[in-house]
Amino acid sequence: VPVPLYHCFGMVMANLGCLSHGACAIYPSEGFEPEAVLDAVEREKATALYGVPTMFIAELALPNFGRYDLSSLRTGIMAGAPCPIETMTQVNELMNMTEVEIAYGMTETSPVSFQTRVDSPLNKRVSTVGKVHPHVEVKIINPDTSEICSVGEMGELCTRGYSVMLGYWENPEAT
């Protein structure tokens, strides 16, 4: 778990994901250090790795990247920014993460609303954020009119479902 625990990616997706599935969470260092991440993957035979695209880019760019045995990796989640196809190809081929998924959401949606699947084609994993999670509804509206936007029109994403928080603690104005 090289992603920060103060963010929903580390705290909810990583910790809660491991806890709910009986998996082990590995914390390679206090802050993100690419060498520490790959050392931990190799030493602990990790099967999954989380990160934002720039974290994977930093790991792949290590001068000694080729010395790490990453054969135990198979999956993970990449989120926080779009992933260039070149990076996703390298993550698939050089890091053995052929089942890495892309996720999109907000802290307020606990934290993911959209996600690709492990079998999503490469081009879908780099050009979309996947499909809406079950039991979650989304729409894109014009913030000035509250009307639903046409396909291709920019607007505000609205999410509804069991995963959406009820409000900000003792802050009704922000809610």
Predicted segments, located by residue:
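Conserved AMP-binding loop of ANL adenylate-forming enzymes
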Residues: 1-26, 51
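Gly/Ser/Thr-rich phosphate-binding loop
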Residues: 20-23, 38, 43-51, 60-124, ...
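Short beta->alpha connector loops at strand-helix junctions that form conserved
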Residues: 28-30
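Alpha-helix capping/helix-boundary segments
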Residues: 54-56, 83, 164
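Short Gly/Pro-enriched turn/cap motifs at secondary-structure boundaries
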Residues: 126-132, 148
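Conserved beta-loop-beta connector loops within the AMP-binding
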Residues: 139-158
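Short secondary-structure edge/capping micro-motifs at helix/strand boundaries
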Residues: 174-175
